[in-house]
């Protein structure tokens, strides 16, 4: 699922600082960095299981992961030091960005409580942060200046699971 296609969207992270912002002061000529701007945060579903509770009491819902899933850090342009970019994003937004996130085989999803008379889907996948990046260089006059073209970043933040609940249909026989 691409961003914007029936994805569940989440609030964007707040910037913690203006480090590397083009036009701001820097201290060492020749230093390089990247200025990152968050654009979208969404749930990338990788798997789901339908669940229904036709009983009169709430019930716990769990699922065992049957396929290993992996989400990796992706950049639309060749960038020197993707690991360094992950560190910059961690410092900018306060979340820990890593190269990849996994759902492991036989890992448990849940438990979630499914109310009586309800149905739904237990869905799991990853929270993805879409961002734009711009490499910068510290000029001799101690100002961050754009270097190269802007690029797109798709960074996994964490594994995510949720129980999406609907009203269970009642059939008359």
Where are these regions (language model features)?
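Membrane-insertion modules used to breach or fuse lipid bilayers
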Residues: 53-116
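Hydrophobic alpha-helical membrane segments, chiefly transmembrane helices and signal peptide h-regions
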Residues: 75-81, 127-131, 135-136, 160
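Membrane pore-forming effector domains from diverse proteins
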Residues: 96-155
